[in-house]
């Protein structure tokens, strides 16, 4: 009884969309498989001086260990680390001062960045720290990022190519301690990095990934420094885009940094994902609109429902089962490749759950401009800049 399914126009369209989503998922997996993930760079004879800038605000139980990993860098070249806070009474200051005292051989200092301007406080701190940085390479990193001792050495290696001005790397959610975070880990540890690599099969990388970015100071100054980004939500995206527009190349390091987070519930994770969705929609409205086509569980599920209405239940269930099963297998393989010891952090059933929820987030990205970010209500303008909503 396949004939009614084949001739019904809507079923034909849905079958085509389900097939297209499977092809896009497979393409995404193949692009990721070709990337030399976790490979170390052998660049001991290339050790340019580096300034590490770390904007901070508040702390949790993971902060000290994450910051300590930066003091453990085994880099043969000159390097320094500058920590920036807006308030000298911030609870993170005690951690930083303690780490500086415990590691006297590391050139490190805490900078209180007062009277900051701009909607993006993190970038405002970076702009202040940039003025104090001593070296020609600037490495910026979020507070929750944890790295291996050879991280700086691996990041500088792509800069042997003089035309390369910016190096970034992938990041993974390292400690999804709640079901909500395990759900989010599917988006980060399976989908995000593989989608970035999928995009590079069509055109060179022209945006940056925010967890850790290394940039030549000269290229940064060409775009006006961090001061030109203080009102941007997606400051990492804009940093990479503007440097690429100035004719420089961007590179991906094969290292993966870890992002450690405190436990979060569904409400907190949903707000984060909605902010992320609206950010991507503003940055790349066209590609984001068509990204719904790559939802590997949504279209097969809709096809199964449509097949039920046309009397082809078994065909619909079989087609949906094969497509969603492939999506689960490939997503779990991507998570294993991305994680040390090939360890899974998300159970298989969260893969289709993530896809179905992603469809709602996709719609929500187009239905509003407000976000909640760092405890503040903000509105995102069409150009990606922020406006206080309260």
Predicted regions and their residues:
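Acidic donor-binding segment of Leloir-type glycosyltransferases
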Residues: 67-117
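Catalytic donor/gating beta->alpha subdomain of glycosyltransferases that bind UDP-sugars
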Residues: 159-192, 218-221, 226-288, 383-385
